[in-house]
């Protein structure tokens, strides 16, 4: 019933909650994968991810651009994530500490 999959961490861009209940969508360098889980469960398994919004977990090392005014993060695949107002500074610092 349960499938297990692994991706190199550097290929993970971000995860978002799905419109379908109790599901999460994973965006990677090559794939888009939807599976049953919560962001909280994923975060417990992979603490290198950063929660930038209640609906998103990101891999800060793959952020291409941070737009503080619009509160958006952009990724190499053209995807974007929202940043909660109170998380902008934390996300900005995490990205700056990587580069």
Where do the model's predicted regions map?
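Long, non-transmembrane cytosolic or organellar matrix-exposed soluble domains/tails
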Residues: 76-99
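Conserved binding/recognition cores within well-folded domains
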Residues: 1-80
């Amino acid at each position: 019933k349960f499938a297990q999959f692994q991706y190199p961490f550097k290929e993970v861009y971000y995860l978002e909650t799905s419109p379908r209940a109790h599901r999460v969508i994973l965006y990677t360098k090559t794939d888009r994968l939807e599976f049953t889980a919560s962001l909280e469960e994923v975060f417990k398994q992979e603490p290198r991810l950063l929660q930038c919004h209640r609906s998103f977990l990101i891999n800060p090392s793959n952020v291409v651009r941070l737009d503080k005014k619009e509160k958006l993060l952009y990724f190499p695949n053209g995807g974007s994530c929202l940043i909660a107002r109170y998380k902008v500074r934390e996300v900005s610092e995490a990205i700056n500490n990587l580069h």
